[in-house]
Amino acid sequence: MSNIEERVIKVIAEQLNVDEGQVKADAHFIDDLGADSLDLVELVMTLEKEFDCEIPDEEAEKITTVQSAIDFVKSR
């Protein structure tokens, strides 16, 4: 697992208040990790701060799983 993946998983676990063991690549934020729309907004803001990047709204809407978050951060 890369450093980026580890950091994304840690951010997601902390932001959604779940154990890092639950944060699997195919986990869906809402269906699997119990997030709501406010959680997702806060998660995007935290990822932007942690990785010093901007996530446009149209891209943020596509980030629905752990893997999609990892892929987005890696692409920046």
UniProtKB/Swiss-Prot annotation:
UniProt domain Carrier: residue ranges: 2-76
GO MF assignments: acyl binding; acyl carrier activity
Listed PROSITE patterns: CARRIER, PHOSPHOPANTETHEINE
Domain of life from the UniProt record: Bacteria
Pfam family name, one: PP-binding
Gene3D superfamilies linked to this entry: ACP-like (1.10.1200.10)
PTM description: 4'-phosphopantetheine is transferred from CoA to a specific serine of apo-ACP by AcpS. This modification is essential for activity because fatty acids are bound in thioester linkage to the sulfhydryl of the prosthetic group.
A Gene Ontology cellular-component term: membrane
One Gene Ontology term from the biological process aspect of the record: lipid A biosynthetic process
Localization (cell): Cytoplasm
Pathway: Lipid metabolism; fatty acid biosynthesis
Function, as annotated: Carrier of the growing fatty acid chain in fatty acid biosynthesis.
HAMAP family xrefs: Acyl_carrier
Family per record: Belongs to the acyl carrier protein (ACP) family.
UniProt-recorded name of the protein: Acyl carrier protein
